[in-house]
Structure formats: structure tokens, C-alpha cells
């Protein structure tokens, strides 16, 4: 019995010792991490001079500090702060305290008392300002702690009387960021505190230092951004600052006046030295208009930009901005009848041609002039004639915004916008054209205005010309002479710049469809028809003749009497153009002929609900594929893929979703075919052909998943997870095929290890989405991960093969809006049989013009590939300036590709195509573990692969041997 008790005692003692060993091991693991505070303390103690201490602090600032080490580091810094006499070192310590208080996971309320205490005893103004900045960082980190906010506001108020402008600036900044907001509170103290903050800040509008005045205005604007409603009394204070000597103050005051005018637009304010009253928004509009003539171009730009957002202004004040002569000698202008009546009633004698023209008049008191009229008068005229092009651009943008909200103002500002088409700066001309296009629905061009607009077609800039073509597409013309003038000028443009052909044809298409009644009387002249004589048939290869036909045919679509004027050859030309240029020539009901329909039958009308319902039903039906036998599953997938592809052809609005779903089902079909039992039941050497089939299927699945991930815009994270999961299955299939055809075990170790690393990487990147992947391939892999890590390659391959067959078909959630990226190469057309000749060894420039649809970040992803007959491939990276953005989801690529090669004996064709570069690492969501890992910054910008997304164009070239 005693021996048994002794044995039990030893057993219990042994268990206790094991627990102690675990604790000791844990402590050792923690102690391996060096202490930041201890290292900093040792460095500061080693410093023999303030310069050394400052150097150590600068080195420490470059190293990251963990949240659990921040408090110890702060204590060391504060301890050294009290000992330090040099202000530069104290300044750096104060800066470090502010940086450390922003550390994620650290609550800075424990250092606030120390920061306030050292603030009370500090004498250096620079250190004071830095300490206030630290307190601002602490207060911003603790927004819910009202007591802390109030305490910091009190500290800021006490130091507002400091003689240094930097300290006062920081105090005002702290008040603007931490001042209490007005809410539904019951205590009067909180409401009064909010009002006091505004009053305290407003008192510093008249500070002697302009930097403090600017900081006070910005603090008031910060209160507004945080949700505090500013008082109307601030308006008068801000108006006085418009005449300040410093541009920073005037610029901030303009912004504050705009804010108050948006808060109290309908409030009534008196006009100085007058019995009249006016709406506050009108008064503010006049004052901001006055600042368009400010001496500083920065203030003028800001004033012009703010004018565009003041849509509540009265129409008569708005119209004053376009008339310089509204004020006569800074007086209110009276009508001619009133002036004549006053002259005759005065009885003044005149020796000149005009009655009373030399009569004495009272001296004008410029200080008593009504500021509203003198401010708003001609503001936009001054802005559009400014010497700085930035001001002119801002004025044009403001005109656009106001004209969009007021059709009457749009008509009145039309002349001024048309005049801006002749500006010396290309950017201003381009902005003016874009502005007119935005307001084109509210205006109709007169002939003189149209003449000025069409003169821009001679501009050497392609961007200007194409922007003008876009403008003419949506412009209303008043007369048939205007249509004829536009056609003549566009044909001149076509002759001078043949590369504008497609843009001009598109312009004439919309010009004809918008003005059918104006085109009708011009048809006999344009087609050169005669009532009695047959005229010669024009050349169908002439781009100018095609342009005329495009104009006429689009006008005939809504004008049923026009086809009767067509001759026989015109009808033949219509049939030809309807086939070759169907996107420019509409379907017409011609006499004696059937309606030429489009590719979509007329009885099919796009209804979103039935098509969407059919799409959903097809996908729901196919997700039951795992319950069918392999042959039935393959047939169901094939039929569904065919239906989805046809649906995408018929319904353009569902093309992206249908193609996306069909591609995913195609990947699943390839996987099912590759996993058929007959391929794997016999030894691999007897089925090399089937192994090649499985390897090709894995490769194709990889390519299709990259297309799904990077060729479609609107793909969300939940779709990326499913796509990456499918790619992981393809990699597993590739590993299985490689293992069956590889001799020896050694090469498999590296491949299996790499695959398991990819599985682990997938888990870490998409850990939040793993619950949605139950019973999937990766879910079963993760369950067996410890076993896989310890298994031999042969066992790993067997497990992968079993899990691939048993994995379920994952449901792919469809995004709300998804579009497939596409590109069309316009130039080179690839139709010419004349080779492009150049000397071998030198280069020749090939112009490339392409339209891009639904491409994300084209500046970094779109590449141009040139494939030579000998197999050489050249990839060109277009410059960011080569891309244009004509509309949402659309881009235009205009670039030059330089070709070079050795001498050839005869001309051959090179292929030009557009590629979409991708990097799968850039789409992976950022995880905390990834941020801490040491990853190369080049991974984000490197190119992992490319996807062709345009049809190749073949160009004849002929490198000639150099002459000797």
C-alpha cells in the first residue's frame, strides 16, 4: 500500500513538472523578442550631446513599434523629456508621442495627463505647437470620450493668447477638430459650449497675423464638415475678410461664404447704405462673383469653381454675370425711357448733338455703390477673358454646371462658350467643347455660331476634332443651310484628315437622325439627282460619298417621304452599306422592297424579366449536376452552355452575365471530362493520349479562370473565391497528370510542396469566405492538411485524385453588374495590299487606333503585341497619355507602334493585337498577415500573364535592304 501511495505521489509530481516546463518554454519564446523601450533607453543614455540624442530618436522613428510596446516607449520618452534641456530634442520627442498615440490597438488616454502637464511648463513656442498637435492626435483617437474632448478644448482656449502664431494656429485647429457638436442634448452647458466654440473661433477672424486668420476660417469649415451648423452671424464677419491683404485669407473666406449661403439660402440680408433687402444666397453670389476679379489667380480659380455649385441663385442675378454693360459708371442702370424723361424734365441746355450731354452731374461715391450689381456684373465675362488658363477652365466648368440647371441661362451663355472655341490653350478649347456637349439638349445653334464651331475642325489636334464630332452628334441646328454647312465642313475635314473617317461617319449618322426635315430638301442636291436626266453613278469606295449616304439614310428612317427621291443606284448602295456598315445605316422601309431587318428578329423584343428569369432557371437546373450520371451531367452542361451563349447574343444587356456563367460551366465541363474513370483505371503508360487530354483540360481551365477574373468588370470578392477555387482544382489535376507521367519520386516532392503552399495561401487570403465552401475540394483539403503535410508524394496524389472526384459543384453567385472587356482595332484596318516599306535595321511608325469597352485601369493593363512571321513577338506598353476617356466604361487608345526587322525577300504580314495584362496577386484581398510579411513591392506591378481580347489585324510590311 505504501509503495502504491509513493507511486501516485511521484506521478502527480511528474505532471506538475511538465506544466512548469511548458510555462518556462512560453516565457522563453516571449523573451526572444527585444524590448523596444529598453533599447531606446539604452540609446538615449549613451547620447553625450543633444545632437546624438536627436540622431537616436530619428533612427527610432524609422522602426515600427507594436501596440503592446507603445506604453513602455512612451514612458521612456517622457522620462527623457523632463531631463532634456535642448528644445530640438524635446520637439522630436513631442512629435514621436503624437505618432505613437496613433498606433493601432493602443489607447492614448494613459499619456494625456502627462502631455497636458508638460504643456503647462513648456516655454518653447515650437515645442508648444508640437505638443498641441500631439493632443489633437490623442483627441482624434478618442472621439467617444466627451470628458477628454472638453478637457482638450479648455487647454486649447487657454493657449489662444500665446504670442506665437504657430501655437494659436494649432489651438484653432484643435478647436475645429474637437469642439463639441450641437446634438439633441438636455444639458444647457453642452449647447453653450458648442456656441462658445464658434464665438471663440470667430473672434480670431480679426487676428493681426494672416496665418491665424486663415487657421480660424479653416477651423470653422472643419466644424461644418463635422456636422455642426454654423451661425448666420458668421456671414458678415466672412464678408469683411474678402478685402483682406493676404490671398490665403481671401481664399478661405470665399469658401466660408459659400458654405453659409448653402446653409441659409433664403435668409434675408440688408443691402449696405440702402433700404432694400436681398436673399442671402444672391448676396453671397454677388460677393463671390466680385472675387473673380481678385488680384490672385488662386482666389479667382476658387471663386469661379464655387459659382458653378450655386444653383439656388435668382435668374436675374445669374444673367448679370454675362453682361459687362449692365452697370453704367457703377450706378444702377435705368431704361432708355427713364433717362430721356429725366433729361427733358431737367431743361438743361446742350451745345452738342445730344440733349443734356454736357450737363453737370453729381460726383459718384464709390463706397456707396451697390455691391450686388457691381459684383455679379460680367463675372463670367471676366473669368472667360482671364490671363490665366486655369481661371478660364474653372469659369467654363462653372458655366456648364449653371447652364445644366437653367435652360434660359444656357441660351444666353452660348455665345461666350462658342467664343472659347478659339482659345489659345488646347485644354481650354477641349473643355469648352465638352461643356457645350453637356448642355446641347437645351440649346439650338444659329448659323453664325455654327460657323464658329465648324472652324475648329481645322485644328491640328485629333482630340479637339473628335470632341467636336461628338458635339455635333448631339447639337440642334436651326436651318437647312446650317446642315449643309456642317456637311461641307465635315467633308473638308475628311479630305484633310482621312484618319477621322469613322468619327465623321458616326457624327453624320446622328446629325441626320436628329434633323430629318432639314435634310429632306437637300437630298436632290446631295445625291445629284435630276428629274429628267440620269446622272452618273458615284464611286462606292469614296469615303465622302459614303458620308453623304450615311447622313441621308439616317434621316430617311423617320422621314417616310424621303426614299421616293432615291435613284436605283442609291437603293443598290443602300443594300451594300446595310451589310457592310450596319452600325451606321439603319433598316429602312423602301418602296417595293421588304423591310431589311437586323440580325435580331423583329418579333423578339428585349424584356429584362423573362430573360433574367431564363438565366436564373438555367443556372439553378445545372447546379443539380452532381446528382446525375457522368454522361447526363456532360449533356446538361453542354446544352446549358449553348443556351447561355445564345442568350448573350440576343440580349446585349445580359451578355456579360451570360458569358461569365457559360465560361464557369465550361470549366466544370472540362473538369468532369478529365476526371472520367476510364482515364484513371489503367496504368498511365497505356493511356498517354488520355493523359494529354487531361493536361490540356487543366491548362484550358487555368486560362478560362484568368479570363473570368480579369476580363470582366464588376467581379466581386465572392466570385473571385469561386474562380480561385476552380483554378486550384485545375492545378491539382495538373499535378496528378504530371505525377502519372513522371518517373521517380524526387521531382514530385517539390511539386507537392508548392501545391500545398498554394492551398495554405488560399486559406489565408479567403479565410472569411471558407464557411461558404462547405464540402468543396478545398474544404476537404484543409481537413486533411496535417495528413498531407506528413505524407509521401504518392499518397498525396491519391488523396487529391479521390477528393477531386468527390468534391461538389460550387454555386457561382452572379454580380449585379458585370461586363466583358472588349477591344476593336480601327487602325490599321488590315485591308491594304500595299506593303509598308522601310529600310531594314531602321524603324517605321505604325499608327494604332482602338476602342476599349469595360476595361479596368487600361493605362496599366492594356498592351499592344506585334507578331512577326518568324515567330518573334514584341510587346509594347502604351503611354498613359495615349488613352482617352470619351465616356463611362469606354476608352480610346491612340498610339504609335515602332516596327523593325532585318531585310526580307518579299513582303509578309505581321499581326497586331491588344493584350490584357494581369497579376493575380493584385486582386487578392489584403489580410493582416500579408501586411506584416516581407513581400517585394514589385509583385504588385509585375505582369503574370496576358489575355488576347481583340481580333488580330494583319499588316503588310516590307523591310528593304539598306543601300550601299
UniProtKB/Swiss-Prot annotation:
One of its GO terms (biological process) is RNA polymerase II transcription initiation surveillance. Keywords: Acetylation, Cytoplasm, Isopeptide bond, Nucleus, Repeat, Ubl conjugation. GO terms for molecular function: protein-macromolecule adaptor activity. The modification N6-acetyllysine is found at residue 27. There is a cross-link at residue 792 (Glycyl lysine isopeptide (Lys-Gly) (interchain with G-Cter in SUMO1)). InterPro entries: ARM-like, ARM-type_fold, INTS4_8HBD. HEAT repeats lie at residues 67-106, 146-184, 191-229, 230-264, 278-314, 370-406, 407-445, 447-485. Its main location: nucleus. It is found in: Nucleus; Cytoplasm. There is a cross-link at residue 792 (Glycyl lysine isopeptide (Lys-Gly) (interchain with G-Cter in SUMO2)). GO terms for cellular component: cytoplasm; INTAC complex; integrator complex; nucleolus; nucleus. It comes from the Eukaryota. Component of the Integrator complex, composed of core subunits INTS1, INTS2, INTS3, INTS4, INTS5, INTS6, INTS7, INTS8, INTS9/RC74, INTS10, INTS11/CPSF3L, INTS12, INTS13, INTS14 and INTS15. The core complex associates with protein phosphatase 2A subunits PPP2CA and PPP2R1A, to form the Integrator-PP2A (INTAC) complex. INTS4 is part of the RNA endonuclease subcomplex, composed of INTS4, INTS9, INTS11 and inositol hexakisphosphate (InsP6). Interacts with BRAT1; interaction is required for the assembly of the RNA endonuclease subcomplex. Component of the integrator complex, a multiprotein complex that terminates RNA polymerase II (Pol II) transcription in the promoter-proximal region of genes. Belongs to the Integrator subunit 4 family. This is Integrator complex subunit 4. It comes from Mus musculus (Mouse). The gene is Ints4.
Amino acid at each position: 500500500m505504501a509503495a502504491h501511495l509513493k507511486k501516485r505521489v511521484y506521478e502527480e509530481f511528474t505532471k506538475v513538472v511538465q506544466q512548469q516546463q511548458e510555462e518556462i518554454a512560453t516565457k522563453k519564446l516571449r523573451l526572444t523578442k527585444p524590448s523596444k523601450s529598453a533599447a531606446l533607453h539604452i540609446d538615449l543614455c549613451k547620447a553625450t550631446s543633444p545632437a546624438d540624442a536627436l540622431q537616436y530618436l530619428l533612427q527610432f522613428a524609422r522602426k515600427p513599434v507594436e501596440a503592446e510596446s507603445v506604453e513602455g516607449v512612451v514612458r521612456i520618452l517622457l522620462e527623457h523629456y523632463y531631463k532634456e534641456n535642448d528644445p530640438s530634442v524635446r520637439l522630436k520627442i513631442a512629435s514621436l508621442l503624437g505618432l505613437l498615440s496613433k498606433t493601432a490597438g493602443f489607447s492614448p488616454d494613459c499619456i494625456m495627463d502627462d502631455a497636458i502637464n508638460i504643456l503647462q511648463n513648456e516655454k518653447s513656442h515650437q515645442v508648444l505647437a508640437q505638443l498641441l498637435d500631439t493632443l489633437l492626435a490623442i483627441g482624434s483617437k478618442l472621439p467617444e470620450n466627451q470628458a477628454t474632448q472638453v478637457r482638450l478644448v479648455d487647454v486649447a482656449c487657454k493657449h489662444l493668447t500665446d504670442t506665437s502664431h504657430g501655437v494659436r494656429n494649432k489651438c484653432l485647429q484643435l478647436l475645429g477638430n474637437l469642439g463639441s457638436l450641437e446634438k439633441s442634448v438636455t444639458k444647457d452647458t453642452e449647447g453653450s459650449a458648442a456656441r462658445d466654440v464658434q464665438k471663440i473661433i470667430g473672434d480670431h477672424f480679426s487676428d493681426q497675423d494672416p496665418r491665424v486668420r486663415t487657421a480660424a476660417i479653416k477651423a470653422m469649415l472643419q466644424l461644418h464638415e463635422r456636422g455642426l451648423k454654423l451661425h448666420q452671424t458668421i456671414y458678415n464677419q466672412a464678408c469683411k475678410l474678402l478685402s483682406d491683404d493676404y490671398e490665403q485669407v481671401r481664399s478661405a473666406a470665399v469658401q466660408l461664404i459659400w458654405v453659409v449661403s448653402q446653409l441659409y439660402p433664403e435668409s434675408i440680408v440688408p443691402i449696405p447704405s440702402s433700404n432694400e433687402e436681398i436673399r442671402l444666397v444672391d448676396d453671397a453670389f454677388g460677393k463671390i462673383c466680385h472675387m473673380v476679379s481678385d488680384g490672385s489667380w488662386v482666389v479667382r480659380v476658387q471663386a469661379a469653381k464655387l459659382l458653378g455649385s450655386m444653383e439656388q441663385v435668382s435668374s436675374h442675378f445669374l444673367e448679370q454675370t454675362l453682361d459687362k454693360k449692365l452697370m453704367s459708371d457703377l450706378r444702377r442702370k435705368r431704361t432708355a425711357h427713364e433717362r430721356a424723361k429725366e433729361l427733358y424734365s431737367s431743361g438743361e441746355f446742350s451745345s452738342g448733338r445730344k440733349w443734356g450731354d454736357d450737363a453737370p452731374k453729381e460726383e459718384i461715391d464709390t463706397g456707396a455703390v451697390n455691391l450686388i450689381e457691381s459684383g455679379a456684373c460680367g463675372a463670367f465675362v471676366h473669368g472667360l477673358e482671364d490671363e490665366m488658363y486655369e481661371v478660364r477652365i474653372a469659369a467654363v466648368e462653372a458655366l456648364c454646371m449653371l447652364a445644366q440647371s437653367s435652360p434660359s441661362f444656357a441660351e444666353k451663355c452660348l455665345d461666350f462658350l462658342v467664343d472659347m472655341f478659339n482659345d489659345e490653350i488646347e485644354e481650354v478649347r477641349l473643355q469648352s467643347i465638352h461643356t457645350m456637349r453637356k448642355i446641347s439638349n437645351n440649346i439650338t445653334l444659329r448659323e453664325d455660331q455654327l460657323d464658329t464651331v465648324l472652324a475648329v475642325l481645322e485644328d491640328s489636334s485629333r482630340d479637339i476634332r473628335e470632341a467636336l464630332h461628338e458635339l455635333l452628334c448631339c447639337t440642334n441646328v436651326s436651318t437647312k443651310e446650317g446642315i449643309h454647312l456642317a456637311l461641307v465642313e465635315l467633308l473638308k475635314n475628311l479630305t484633310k484628315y482621312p484618319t477621322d473617317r469613322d468619327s465623321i461617319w458616326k457624327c453624320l449618322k446622328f446629325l441626320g437622325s436628329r434633323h430629318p426635315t432639314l435634310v429632306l430638301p437637300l437630298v436632290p442636291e446631295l445625291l445629284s439627282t435630276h428629274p429628267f436626266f440620269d446622272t452618273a453613278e458615284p464611286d462606292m469606295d469614296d469615303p465622302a460619298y459614303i458620308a453623304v449616304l450615311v447622313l441621308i439614310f439616317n434621316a430617311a428612317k423617320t422621314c417616310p417621304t424621303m426614299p421616293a427621291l432615291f435613284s436605283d443606284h442609291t437603293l443598290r448602295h443602300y443594300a451594300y452599306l446595310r451589310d457592310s456598315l450596319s452600325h451606321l445605316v439603319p433598316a429602312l422601309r423602301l418602296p417595293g422592297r421588304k423591310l431589311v431587318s437586323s440580325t435580331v428578329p423583329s418579333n423578339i423584343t428585349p424584356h429584362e424579366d423573362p430573360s433574367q428569369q431564363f438565366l436564373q432557371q438555367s443556372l439553378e437546373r445545372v447546379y443539380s449536376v452532381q446528382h446525375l450520371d457522368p454522361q447526363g451531367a456532360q449533356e446538361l452542361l453542354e446544352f446549358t452552355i449553348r443556351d447561355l451563349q445564345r442568350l448573350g447574343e440576343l440580349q446585349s444587356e445580359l451578355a456579360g452575365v451570360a458569358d461569365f456563367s457559360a465560361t464557369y460551366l465550361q470549366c466544370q465541363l472540362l473538369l468532369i471530362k478529365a476526371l472520367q474513370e476510364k482515364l484513371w483505371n489503367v496504368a498511365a503508360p497505356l493511356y498517354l493520349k488520355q493523359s494529354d487530354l487531361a493536361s490540356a483540360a487543366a491548362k484550358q481551365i487555368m486560362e478560362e479562370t484568368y479570363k473570368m477574373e480579369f476580363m470582366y468588370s464588376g467581379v466581386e470578392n465572392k466570385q473571385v473565391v469561386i474562380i480561385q477555387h476552380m483554378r486550384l482544382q485545375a492545378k491539382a489535376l495538373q499535378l496528378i497528370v504530371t505525377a502519372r507521367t513522371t518517373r521517380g519520386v524526387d521531382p514530385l516532392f517539390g511539386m507537392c510542396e508548392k501545391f500545398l503552399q498554394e492551398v495554405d495561401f488560399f486559406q489565408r487570403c479567403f479565410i472569411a469566405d471558407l464557411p461558404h465552401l462547405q464540402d468543396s475540394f478545398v474544404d476537404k483539403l484543409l481537413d486533411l492538411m496535417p495528413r498531407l503535410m506528413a505524407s509521401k508524394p504518392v499518397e498525396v496524389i491519391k488523396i487529391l485524385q479521390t477528393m477531386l472526384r468527390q468534391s461538389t459543384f460550387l454555386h457561382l453567385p452572379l454580380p449585379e453588374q458585370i461586363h466583358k472587356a472588349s477591344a476593336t482595332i480601327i487602325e490599321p484596318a488590315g485591308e491594304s495590299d500595299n506593303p509598308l516599306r522601310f529600310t531594314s535595321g531602321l524603324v517605321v511608325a505604325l499608327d494604332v487606333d482602338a476602342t476599349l469597352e469595360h476595361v479596368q485601369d487600361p493605362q496599366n493593363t492594356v498592351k499592344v503585341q506585334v507578331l512577326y512571321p518568324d515567330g518573334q513577338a514584341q510587346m509594347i506598353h502604351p503611354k498613359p497619355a495615349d488613352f482617352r476617356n470619351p465616356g463611362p466604361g469606354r476608352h480610346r487608345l491612340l498610339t504609335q507602334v515602332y516596327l523593325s526587322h532585318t531585310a526580307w525577300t518579299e513582303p509578309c504580314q505581321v499581326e497586331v493585337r491588344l493584350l490584357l495584362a494581369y497579376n493575380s496577386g493584385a486582386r487578392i484581398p489584403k489580410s493582416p498577415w500579408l501586411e506584416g510579411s516581407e513581400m517585394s513591392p514589385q509583385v504588385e506591378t509585375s505582369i503574370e500573364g496576358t489575355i488576347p481580347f481583340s481580333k488580330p489585324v494583319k499588316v503588310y510590311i516590307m523591310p528593304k535592304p539598306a543601300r550601299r
